Amino acid sequence: MKSAILVFPGINRERDMARALQLASGSEPAMVWHADTELPKGTDLVVVPGGFSYGDYLRCGAIAARAPVMDAVRKFASDGGLVLGVCNGFQILCESGLLPGVLMRNARLKFICHDVHLRVERSDTPFTRGYNAGQVIRVPVAHGEGNYEADEETLQRLEGDGRVLYRYCSASGEVGEAHNINGAAASIAGIVSERGNVLGMMPHPENHVEAIMGCTDGRGLFAGLVEHLAKAA
């Protein structure tokens, strides 16, 4: 798997993501600077990592979405390439038009930084094939603006098309207000594009891939991507 990680000023999770991808694929990802206008030839996966691109000025992800490299990412996605955006990366994908909706301030207006439980809603996508449908996984979050919102028509379309891949839940998989950490509509933690090739999620699976981290539940996402791309080759 040949992956490329975008790097913007203020991003701080690119090395964590590189470690997770390297462990899963055995290949070192390429780092792509925000001012570049092309992706490396043969790229299979583009990752937009977490952090605080451009200091979160204007809106989270708003400036990064207009960086030169994003034109290449939009073209890559329109051609069917796989794109993963995590935390600030999710915000950037929404701001760039690759995903619908917006990430708002957390409902309690506080920065959240701890492990959460997610329910995997389906297992037949490149981003979830490493899990079972209904499986509960534990991954960290670290955000102040992770409250996913969209208009009612968009939310109905996301639900009807099965495009919600991850939801906040309890340790036993129960979804509800008590387990919705940031107030996100329908407890949404991660969604995919219409074609299913672009995923945005607020939690950080890359931070739970080694036993020394206390949990390895994030491995499934990366292992599934490697398996999908190997079969598609």
UniProtKB/Swiss-Prot annotation:
PROSITE patterns: GATASE_TYPE_1
SMART domains with a match to the protein in the record: GATase_5 (SM01211)
Pfam families the record matches: GATase_5 (PF13507)
Molecular function GO labels: ATP binding; glutaminase activity; phosphoribosylformylglycinamidine synthase activity
Compartments, record wording: Cytoplasm
CDD domains: GATase1_FGAR_AT (cd01740)
Catalysis: reaction(s): N(2)-formyl-N(1)-(5-phospho-beta-D-ribosyl)glycinamide + L-glutamine + ATP + H2O = 2-formamido-N(1)-(5-O-phospho-beta-D-ribosyl)acetamidine + L-glutamate + ADP + phosphate + H(+); L-glutamine + H2O = L-glutamate + NH4(+)
SUPFAM superfamilies per record: Class I glutamine amidotransferase-like (SSF52317)
Gene Ontology BP annotations: 'de novo' IMP biosynthetic process
UniProt cross-references to InterPro entries, sorted A to Z: Class_I_gatase-like, PRibForGlyAmidine_synth_PurQ
Key words, A-Z: ATP-binding, Cytoplasm, Glutamine amidotransferase, Hydrolase, Ligase, Nucleotide-binding, Purine biosynthesis
Subunit structure: Part of the FGAM synthase complex composed of 1 PurL, 1 PurQ and 2 PurS subunits.
NCBIfam families from the UniProt entry: FGAM_synth_I, PRK03619.1
Name of the protein in its database record: Phosphoribosylformylglycinamidine synthase subunit PurQ
